[in-house]
Amino acid sequence: MRAAVVTKDHKVSIEDKKLRALKPGEALVQTEYCGVCHTDLHVKNADFGDVTGVTLGHEGIGKVIEVAEDVESLKIGDRVSIAWMFESCGRCEYCTTGRETLCRSVKNAGYTVDGAMAEQVIVTADYAVKVPEKLDPAAASSITCAGVTTYKAVKVSNVKPGQWLGVFGIGGLGNLALQYAKNVMGAKIVAFDINDDKLAFAKELGADAIINSKDVDPVAEVMKLTDNKGLDATVVTSVAKTPFNQAVDVVKAGARVVAVGLPVDKMNLDIPRLVLDGIEVVGSLVGTRQDLREAFEFAAENKVTPKVQLRKLEEINDIFEEMENGTITGRMVIKF
Protein backbone atom coordinates (compact mmCIF):
# COMPACT_ATOMS: atom_id res chain seq x y z
CA MET A 1 0.00 0.00 0.00
CA ARG A 2 1.13 3.58 -0.64
CA ALA A 3 2.14 5.72 2.32
CA ALA A 4 3.66 9.18 2.91
CA VAL A 5 6.88 8.45 4.79
CA VAL A 6 9.27 10.93 6.45
CA THR A 7 12.81 10.84 5.00
CA LYS A 8 16.15 11.86 6.53
CA ASP A 9 16.33 15.05 4.46
CA HIS A 10 13.06 16.34 6.00
CA LYS A 11 11.06 15.50 2.91
CA VAL A 12 8.23 13.03 2.41
CA SER A 13 8.51 10.05 0.11
CA ILE A 14 5.57 8.07 -1.27
CA GLU A 15 6.57 4.49 -0.51
CA ASP A 16 5.07 1.03 -0.62
CA LYS A 17 4.57 -0.34 2.90
CA LYS A 18 3.32 -3.74 3.98
CA LEU A 19 1.11 -3.97 7.05
CA ARG A 20 1.48 -6.67 9.69
CA ALA A 21 -1.38 -8.87 10.89
CA LEU A 22 -3.82 -7.42 13.41
CA LYS A 23 -3.19 -7.86 17.12
CA PRO A 24 -5.94 -8.16 19.76
CA GLY A 25 -7.86 -4.91 20.21
CA GLU A 26 -7.03 -3.61 16.74
CA ALA A 27 -8.89 -2.87 13.52
CA LEU A 28 -7.84 -2.27 9.93
CA VAL A 29 -9.12 0.89 8.26
CA GLN A 30 -9.26 1.68 4.55
CA THR A 31 -8.37 5.36 4.43
CA GLU A 32 -10.72 7.69 2.56
CA TYR A 33 -9.34 11.12 3.50
CA CYS A 34 -6.53 12.61 5.55
CA GLY A 35 -6.12 16.29 6.35
CA VAL A 36 -2.68 17.91 6.39
CA CYS A 37 -1.92 19.67 9.67
CA HIS A 38 0.85 22.09 10.64
CA THR A 39 1.93 19.48 13.19
CA ASP A 40 2.71 17.18 10.25
CA LEU A 41 5.10 19.88 9.04
CA HIS A 42 6.77 19.98 12.47
CA VAL A 43 7.12 16.19 12.46
CA LYS A 44 8.55 16.18 8.93
CA ASN A 45 11.07 18.85 9.89
CA ALA A 46 12.12 16.92 13.03
CA ASP A 47 11.12 19.84 15.28
CA PHE A 48 9.99 17.31 17.89
CA GLY A 49 12.80 14.82 17.21
CA ASP A 50 13.84 12.65 14.27
CA VAL A 51 11.16 10.13 13.29
CA THR A 52 12.55 9.11 9.90
CA GLY A 53 10.53 6.24 8.45
CA VAL A 54 7.22 7.04 10.13
CA THR A 55 4.05 7.42 8.08
CA LEU A 56 2.57 10.89 8.59
CA GLY A 57 -1.04 11.84 9.23
CA HIS A 58 -3.42 12.27 12.15
CA GLU A 59 -6.53 13.70 10.48
CA GLY A 60 -7.63 10.43 8.95
CA ILE A 61 -11.11 9.18 8.11
CA GLY A 62 -11.82 5.75 6.72
CA LYS A 63 -13.94 2.61 6.85
CA VAL A 64 -13.23 -0.46 8.94
CA ILE A 65 -12.47 -3.47 6.73
CA GLU A 66 -11.24 -5.94 9.35
CA VAL A 67 -11.35 -6.30 13.14
CA ALA A 68 -9.49 -8.54 15.57
CA GLU A 69 -11.55 -11.34 17.11
CA ASP A 70 -11.86 -9.63 20.50
CA VAL A 71 -13.02 -6.23 19.20
CA GLU A 72 -16.58 -5.28 20.15
CA SER A 73 -16.52 -1.48 19.79
CA LEU A 74 -16.26 -1.52 15.98
CA LYS A 75 -17.64 -3.55 13.11
CA ILE A 76 -16.78 -3.83 9.43
CA GLY A 77 -18.22 -0.85 7.56
CA ASP A 78 -17.99 1.66 10.40
CA ARG A 79 -16.55 5.03 9.40
CA VAL A 80 -13.99 6.10 11.99
CA SER A 81 -11.25 8.59 12.79
CA ILE A 82 -7.48 8.13 12.94
CA ALA A 83 -6.54 10.97 15.28
CA TRP A 84 -3.41 12.42 16.90
CA MET A 85 -4.31 10.72 20.18
CA PHE A 86 -3.88 7.22 18.82
CA GLU A 87 -3.88 5.46 22.20
CA SER A 88 -3.28 6.15 25.90
CA CYS A 89 -2.55 3.84 28.82
CA GLY A 90 -6.03 4.11 30.35
CA ARG A 91 -4.72 3.74 33.90
CA CYS A 92 -2.73 6.84 34.90
CA GLU A 93 -3.91 9.94 36.79
CA TYR A 94 -4.61 11.72 33.49
CA CYS A 95 -6.50 8.89 31.81
CA THR A 96 -8.70 8.30 34.85
CA THR A 97 -9.61 11.98 35.28
CA GLY A 98 -10.73 12.86 31.76
CA ARG A 99 -7.35 14.22 30.63
CA GLU A 100 -6.17 11.32 28.49
CA THR A 101 -4.35 13.56 26.01
CA LEU A 102 -1.79 14.30 28.76
CA CYS A 103 -1.01 10.61 29.37
CA ARG A 104 2.76 10.18 29.62
CA SER A 105 2.52 6.92 27.66
CA VAL A 106 0.33 8.30 24.90
CA LYS A 107 0.89 7.17 21.32
CA ASN A 108 0.43 9.75 18.57
CA ALA A 109 -0.59 8.89 15.01
CA GLY A 110 1.88 10.10 12.43
CA TYR A 111 4.56 10.71 15.05
CA THR A 112 5.24 7.84 17.46
CA VAL A 113 3.21 5.33 15.42
CA ASP A 114 2.37 5.18 11.72
CA GLY A 115 -0.42 7.54 10.79
CA ALA A 116 -3.23 8.04 8.30
CA MET A 117 -1.43 9.27 5.17
CA ALA A 118 -1.60 5.73 3.83
CA GLU A 119 -4.11 3.66 1.93
CA GLN A 120 -4.68 1.47 4.99
CA VAL A 121 -4.06 2.00 8.71
CA ILE A 122 -4.07 -0.27 11.75
CA VAL A 123 -5.84 1.42 14.67
CA THR A 124 -6.55 0.67 18.31
CA ALA A 125 -10.27 -0.02 18.07
CA ASP A 126 -11.35 1.69 21.30
CA TYR A 127 -9.64 4.94 20.22
CA ALA A 128 -11.16 5.12 16.73
CA VAL A 129 -14.13 7.47 17.16
CA LYS A 130 -17.12 6.80 14.92
CA VAL A 131 -18.12 9.52 12.45
CA PRO A 132 -21.82 10.56 12.31
CA GLU A 133 -23.50 9.32 9.13
CA LYS A 134 -24.69 12.79 8.13
CA LEU A 135 -21.21 14.33 8.35
CA ASP A 136 -19.25 14.57 5.09
CA PRO A 137 -16.11 12.43 5.53
CA ALA A 138 -13.80 14.99 3.90
CA ALA A 139 -15.03 17.62 6.35
CA ALA A 140 -14.76 15.10 9.18
CA SER A 141 -11.05 14.72 8.50
CA SER A 142 -10.53 18.37 9.39
CA ILE A 143 -12.57 17.97 12.58
CA THR A 144 -10.41 14.99 13.64
CA CYS A 145 -7.56 17.29 14.65
CA ALA A 146 -8.11 20.95 13.74
CA GLY A 147 -11.75 20.81 14.80
CA VAL A 148 -11.41 18.98 18.08
CA THR A 149 -8.29 20.98 18.97
CA THR A 150 -10.03 24.31 18.57
CA TYR A 151 -13.31 23.11 20.08
CA LYS A 152 -11.41 22.04 23.19
CA ALA A 153 -9.44 25.31 23.25
CA VAL A 154 -12.63 27.36 23.14
CA LYS A 155 -14.01 25.26 26.00
CA VAL A 156 -10.79 25.84 27.96
CA SER A 157 -11.11 29.61 27.38
CA ASN A 158 -14.27 29.62 29.51
CA VAL A 159 -15.83 32.21 27.20
CA LYS A 160 -19.54 32.76 27.82
CA PRO A 161 -22.36 33.76 25.44
CA GLY A 162 -22.06 37.43 24.50
CA GLN A 163 -18.46 37.77 25.68
CA TRP A 164 -15.58 38.80 23.44
CA LEU A 165 -13.14 36.14 22.26
CA GLY A 166 -10.09 36.94 20.15
CA VAL A 167 -8.85 34.33 17.67
CA PHE A 168 -5.27 34.84 16.52
CA GLY A 169 -4.47 33.22 13.18
CA ILE A 170 -7.29 32.42 10.75
CA GLY A 171 -5.80 29.37 9.09
CA GLY A 172 -6.80 25.73 9.25
CA LEU A 173 -7.21 25.92 13.03
CA GLY A 174 -8.34 29.48 13.51
CA ASN A 175 -11.29 29.38 11.13
CA LEU A 176 -12.71 26.45 13.10
CA ALA A 177 -12.02 28.10 16.46
CA LEU A 178 -14.02 31.07 15.20
CA GLN A 179 -16.95 28.86 14.19
CA TYR A 180 -17.06 26.83 17.40
CA ALA A 181 -16.84 29.97 19.52
CA LYS A 182 -19.45 31.86 17.50
CA ASN A 183 -21.94 29.16 16.57
CA VAL A 184 -21.66 26.79 19.53
CA MET A 185 -20.61 28.99 22.46
CA GLY A 186 -22.38 32.18 21.37
CA ALA A 187 -19.32 34.42 21.76
CA LYS A 188 -18.56 37.66 19.91
CA ILE A 189 -15.43 37.23 17.81
CA VAL A 190 -12.46 39.39 16.94
CA ALA A 191 -10.29 37.75 14.28
CA PHE A 192 -6.60 38.69 14.11
CA ASP A 193 -4.28 37.95 11.20
CA ILE A 194 -1.77 39.68 8.93
CA ASN A 195 -3.35 38.33 5.74
CA ASP A 196 -6.31 40.29 4.35
CA ASP A 197 -7.67 37.28 2.45
CA LYS A 198 -7.84 35.27 5.66
CA LEU A 199 -9.49 38.16 7.46
CA ALA A 200 -12.07 38.44 4.68
CA PHE A 201 -12.72 34.73 5.15
CA ALA A 202 -13.16 35.32 8.88
CA LYS A 203 -15.75 37.99 8.13
CA GLU A 204 -17.61 35.54 5.89
CA LEU A 205 -17.66 33.07 8.78
CA GLY A 206 -19.31 35.61 11.05
CA ALA A 207 -16.49 37.41 12.85
CA ASP A 208 -17.85 40.53 14.56
CA ALA A 209 -14.59 42.40 13.96
CA ILE A 210 -11.37 41.78 12.06
CA ILE A 211 -7.96 43.28 12.79
CA ASN A 212 -4.87 43.16 10.59
CA SER A 213 -2.25 43.28 13.33
CA LYS A 214 0.48 44.14 10.82
CA ASP A 215 -1.23 47.34 9.68
CA VAL A 216 -2.69 48.62 12.97
CA ASP A 217 -2.00 48.40 16.70
CA PRO A 218 -4.18 45.46 17.84
CA VAL A 219 -4.30 46.69 21.44
CA ALA A 220 -5.57 50.14 20.44
CA GLU A 221 -8.17 48.62 18.11
CA VAL A 222 -9.43 46.24 20.79
CA MET A 223 -9.71 49.03 23.34
CA LYS A 224 -11.81 51.08 20.92
CA LEU A 225 -14.01 48.06 20.29
CA THR A 226 -14.55 47.19 23.97
CA ASP A 227 -14.75 50.63 25.63
CA ASN A 228 -11.20 50.24 26.98
CA LYS A 229 -12.01 46.98 28.75
CA GLY A 230 -10.20 44.39 26.64
CA LEU A 231 -11.27 40.95 25.50
CA ASP A 232 -12.69 38.29 27.81
CA ALA A 233 -10.45 35.56 26.37
CA THR A 234 -8.16 34.75 23.47
CA VAL A 235 -7.26 31.58 21.58
CA VAL A 236 -3.95 31.60 19.71
CA THR A 237 -3.65 29.23 16.77
CA SER A 238 -0.79 31.10 15.08
CA VAL A 239 2.62 29.55 14.46
CA ALA A 240 4.60 32.74 15.11
CA LYS A 241 5.73 34.24 18.42
CA THR A 242 4.30 37.76 18.08
CA PRO A 243 0.59 36.83 18.18
CA PHE A 244 1.10 34.98 21.47
CA ASN A 245 2.40 38.14 23.10
CA GLN A 246 -0.36 40.24 21.51
CA ALA A 247 -2.98 37.81 22.81
CA VAL A 248 -1.93 38.67 26.36
CA ASP A 249 -1.86 42.41 25.64
CA VAL A 250 -5.45 42.61 24.36
CA VAL A 251 -7.28 40.87 27.23
CA LYS A 252 -8.97 42.36 30.29
CA ALA A 253 -8.19 41.59 33.92
CA GLY A 254 -9.18 38.06 34.90
CA ALA A 255 -9.07 36.85 31.29
CA ARG A 256 -7.69 33.58 30.00
CA VAL A 257 -5.24 33.21 27.09
CA VAL A 258 -5.27 29.76 25.49
CA ALA A 259 -2.17 28.68 23.56
CA VAL A 260 -2.80 26.20 20.76
CA GLY A 261 -0.32 26.88 17.94
CA LEU A 262 3.19 25.47 18.16
CA PRO A 263 5.84 28.00 17.11
CA VAL A 264 9.34 26.82 17.90
CA ASP A 265 9.93 29.79 20.19
CA LYS A 266 9.23 31.25 23.64
CA MET A 267 6.71 33.84 24.81
CA ASN A 268 7.67 37.13 26.46
CA LEU A 269 5.40 37.44 29.47
CA ASP A 270 4.87 40.64 31.47
CA ILE A 271 4.85 38.90 34.85
CA PRO A 272 3.65 41.90 36.92
CA ARG A 273 0.65 42.29 34.58
CA LEU A 274 -0.18 38.59 34.82
CA VAL A 275 -0.08 38.77 38.61
CA LEU A 276 -1.75 42.14 39.15
CA ASP A 277 -4.49 41.55 36.57
CA GLY A 278 -4.97 37.85 37.33
CA ILE A 279 -4.47 36.80 33.72
CA GLU A 280 -4.20 33.07 33.05
CA VAL A 281 -2.06 31.71 30.21
CA VAL A 282 -2.80 28.04 29.57
CA GLY A 283 -2.00 25.45 26.95
CA SER A 284 -4.63 23.26 25.32
CA LEU A 285 -3.63 20.00 23.63
CA VAL A 286 -5.99 18.52 21.02
CA GLY A 287 -9.01 16.87 22.70
CA THR A 288 -10.21 13.65 24.26
CA ARG A 289 -12.33 11.04 22.51
CA GLN A 290 -15.41 12.60 24.08
CA ASP A 291 -14.36 16.05 22.85
CA LEU A 292 -14.04 14.57 19.35
CA ARG A 293 -17.51 13.01 19.51
CA GLU A 294 -18.95 16.40 20.48
CA ALA A 295 -16.95 18.22 17.80
CA PHE A 296 -18.20 15.75 15.17
CA GLU A 297 -21.82 16.23 16.27
CA PHE A 298 -21.68 20.03 16.04
CA ALA A 299 -20.22 19.71 12.54
CA ALA A 300 -22.94 17.21 11.61
CA GLU A 301 -25.50 19.81 12.77
CA ASN A 302 -23.90 22.33 10.36
CA LYS A 303 -22.85 24.62 13.18
CA VAL A 304 -19.28 24.25 11.95
CA THR A 305 -18.27 23.87 8.30
CA PRO A 306 -14.60 23.16 7.58
CA LYS A 307 -13.22 24.70 4.41
CA VAL A 308 -11.36 21.89 2.68
CA GLN A 309 -9.56 21.48 -0.61
CA LEU A 310 -8.99 17.97 -1.93
CA ARG A 311 -5.47 17.07 -3.03
CA LYS A 312 -3.56 13.98 -4.15
CA LEU A 313 -1.11 12.04 -1.98
CA GLU A 314 1.64 12.80 -4.48
CA GLU A 315 1.21 16.53 -3.80
CA ILE A 316 2.21 16.27 -0.14
CA ASN A 317 5.56 18.07 -0.48
CA ASP A 318 3.87 20.85 -2.47
CA ILE A 319 1.31 21.20 0.32
CA PHE A 320 4.05 21.55 2.92
CA GLU A 321 5.74 24.24 0.81
CA GLU A 322 2.45 26.16 0.58
CA MET A 323 2.04 25.77 4.33
CA GLU A 324 5.50 27.19 5.01
CA ASN A 325 4.73 30.12 2.70
CA GLY A 326 1.48 30.86 4.54
CA THR A 327 -0.66 30.69 1.41
CA ILE A 328 -3.22 28.12 2.60
CA THR A 329 -6.71 29.15 3.67
CA GLY A 330 -8.71 26.38 5.30
CA ARG A 331 -7.46 22.79 5.15
CA MET A 332 -5.72 20.71 2.52
CA VAL A 333 -7.19 17.19 2.54
CA ILE A 334 -5.70 14.20 0.75
CA LYS A 335 -8.24 11.99 -0.99
CA PHE A 336 -7.37 8.31 -1.31
Curated annotation (Swiss-Prot):
Residues that hold Zn(2+) 2 according to the record: C89, C92, C95, C103
Named cofactor requirement(s): Zn(2+)
Record keyword Disulfide bond present: no
Listed GO biological process terms: acetaldehyde catabolic process
Covalent S-S links between cysteines: none
Keywords of the record: Metal-binding, NAD, Oxidoreductase, Zinc
Enzyme Commission no: 1.1.1.1
GO molecular function, one term: zinc ion binding
Taxonomy, superkingdom: Bacteria
Xref: SMART domains: PKS_ER
Cofactor note: Binds 2 Zn(2+) ions per subunit.
Chain sites annotated for binding Zn(2+) 1: C37, H58, C145
CDD domains reported in the protein's UniProt record: CAD3
Reactions catalysed: a primary alcohol + NAD(+) = an aldehyde + NADH + H(+); a secondary alcohol + NAD(+) = a ketone + NADH + H(+)
Similarity section: Belongs to the zinc-containing alcohol dehydrogenase family.
Protein name: Alcohol dehydrogenase
Gene from which this protein is expressed: adh
